Amino acid sequence: HTDPRWFAENLPFTDPAHLLITPDHYVFRMLYSQGVGLEKLGIPRLDGGSVEEDPRQIWQLFSQYYYLFAGTPVGAWFDHVFAEVFGMSENLTPENSESFYNTIDTALRTPDFLPRNIVDRFKIEVISTTDDATHTLAHHQVIQDSGWGGKVIPTFRPDGVSNIIHPDWRTNINALGELVGTELTTYSAFINALQIRREFFKNMGATSTDHGVATPLPME
């Protein structure tokens, strides 16, 4: 769950909320299940309506519900990050929420917490991102051309074109056809397009594919 743009641009992360809460569906789905509106967490609305933009307010709200993550993998991960990365061993609560935020925010503004420096500091050998079949992988190309020693490779995830109930399925199919220069009006043309894109991903360093199958359908 990393964005290749981070490592291509190598810019400071904006703030704790938009790094650790807003983009993480494991976090906001838990809060949503307990009645927290997604707009209060800064999640964009489909209708373009207003959402919370103050990262401190988002973080404060997160701290009020942090107890929900006790005993979960997400909670264990957060506790580890707070203690080992930012040096805060106490439990996050609404009372110390501001202190947590300030500590993380200050750290994110230092060179040590630039995306590439984090990879180097933790001796991460390889990061594999998850990318749609129609991705141009432009950010991966920037990383490869940058001279940086870190390794960030794509993973081929064709759900957007293989899942016919995906809301953007037809748009994605058209985009796939444009990328390979073929009108995808037959199943064989579709399979050939996937093979072409998979080969492109392999040439960009991909070593795996990722498929989300929500409901397996029997043959009979």
Predicted regions and their residues:
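Metal-cofactor-binding active-site regions of metalloenzymes
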Residues: 2-220
